Amino acid sequence: MKTFDELFAELQERARTRPEGSATVAALDAGVHAQGKKVIEEAGEVWIAAEYESDEALAEEISQLLYRLQVVMLGRGLSLEDVYRYL
């Protein structure tokens, strides 16, 4: 299990080192527009899971949304501090 901050650090490292076959690298290369679409898709899946599925399924969907949001952050060059400033 990892925290939000740990995941972000891991994704930053992947963005920096660009390991071959990395889904995160492919997502970053697809651009912010493509990742924005994925955010919308995952948000819809969170909503459906919240309405009709188990807590476990909901937690998994939320984790996927958080991942996509972090990829958008990296694509735009935002840090966690940039976001935490508004919490």
Curated annotation (Swiss-Prot):
CDD domains: NTP-PPase_HisE (cd11547)
Alphabetical UniProt keywords: Amino-acid biosynthesis, ATP-binding, Cytoplasm, Histidine biosynthesis, Hydrolase, Nucleotide-binding
Subcellular location: Cytoplasm
InterPro entries: HisE, PRib-ATP_PPHydrolase-like
EC number: 3.6.1.31
Pfam families: PRA-PH
One of the protein's GO biological processes: L-histidine biosynthetic process
GO terms under cellular component: cytoplasm
One of the record's GO molecular function terms: phosphoribosyl-ATP diphosphatase activity
Annotated metabolic or biological route of this protein: Amino-acid biosynthesis; L-histidine biosynthesis; L-histidine from 5-phospho-alpha-D-ribose 1-diphosphate: step 2/9
Catalytic activity of the protein: 1-(5-phospho-beta-D-ribosyl)-ATP + H2O = 1-(5-phospho-beta-D-ribosyl)-5'-AMP + diphosphate + H(+)
Family named by the database record: Belongs to the PRA-PH family.
Name of the protein described by the UniProt record: Phosphoribosyl-ATP pyrophosphatase
Organism of origin: Saccharopolyspora erythraea (strain ATCC 11635 / DSM 40517 / JCM 4748 / NBRC 13426 / NCIMB 8594 / NRRL 2338)
